Amino acid sequence: MKMTKMTALLLAAAMALTACGGTTAVSSEAASSSAAAPEVTASPEEAAVEPAAAETAVTYPLTVTDQLGREVTIETEPKTLASGYYISTSLLIALGVQDELVGVEAKADKRTIYSLSAPELQSLPSIGTAKEFDLEGCAALTPDLVIVPAKLKDSIPQMEELGLTVLAVKPEDQDKLYGAIDLLAQATNTVARGEELKSAIEDNLLSLHEAIGDAEAPTVYMAGNSSVLQTAGPAMYQNYMIENAGGLNAAASVEDTYWAEVSYEQVLDWDPDYIILASDADYDVDSVLNDAALADCTAVREGYVYQLPHAIEAVDSPVPGSFLGSVYLGSVLHPEQVSEQFYHDCADAFYTTYYGFTPASYE
């Protein structure tokens, strides 16, 4: 059988991801003597998958259940999409259907991952935010399918009255992220691509878990976007990242479902081994290290304060690439088991395969 250029590209990229997912994440010294993941470079257009040629066909009309439990019937294969949520927009890029987007969430022009993978999205009409969704603006674009965050559940009936077919997503943990991938892959007739995406994530997390093994789990305090006195409890996605990286959440007793406000006294009482700043924190590592109120905290005293990667996207949000946050965190918490190079290789392979670019920065 003759191999097309697209088939050859996808095969090479899959090999790169397999190399990352299957490589033991050993220390940097050992990693330097082993082969790095194969380098694959591709433009966003080449990396995109053409559903009709490469995917398992979906039959329409199609009835799916979205992440609010709503049964939604999609009458015909959607050719135009609108996404009111950066997480679903990123997921649609990973599924290779970015060219079908006609409207995206507000501030798309500020998202680095869009400029690297699908710059045309940054000039598309905005359909607002979860707080201020532009119903009429979205309807004017006449999209075949609209994807919104579950926070907009009260607005969905109005969207439907305007003739829009709407799916809500709520990828608040690892399983629900996989559920969002399944939902959108099925809706957009990209099922095979969705399965590949999930397998890539699962394989890399499995490699991470195997590398960490039974290493002792340090306690981790995950600090929020606005203040070091915000933290993520077990109900938040960040908790799964800590667990995936072989750590224990210092705020495991917190019951809030969003960033919890805590006191300096509480942080000192928990006395975490590490303090990790959110990707989008509007303060920096030095400000925490120099905070006199935290001087007696083990993490500060030992200099174990880090910020999650943010150069490409916020990896502590439930986007497809969020597993890289766990890999990075694993390299911080368990440097003898998980090398920094392993994190770089995983990032290279993932973004090349699913977003069409090779990272210039891993921070």
Mark where each language-model region is:
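Sec-dependent N-terminal signal peptides of Gram-positive bacterial secreted proteins and lipoproteins
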Residues: 2-24
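Bacterial lipoprotein signal-peptidase II cleavage site
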Residues: 20-38
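N-terminal low-complexity, Pro/Thr/Ser-rich intrinsically disordered segments
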Residues: 36-70, 74-75
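Extracytoplasmic substrate-binding proteins
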Residues: 56, 61-64, 71-73, 155-230, ...
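Structural recognition of the beta-strand scaffold that forms the well-ordered cores
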Residues: 82-84, 100-105, 145-149, 166-170, ...
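A short, structured surface patch at a secondary-structure boundary
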Residues: 83-141, 145-147, 151, 250
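Proline-aspartate-enriched helix->loop->beta-strand connector
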Residues: 127-130, 135-148, 164, 263-280
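Alpha-helical, coiled-coil/dimerization segments enriched in small aliphatic residues
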Residues: 231-259, 263
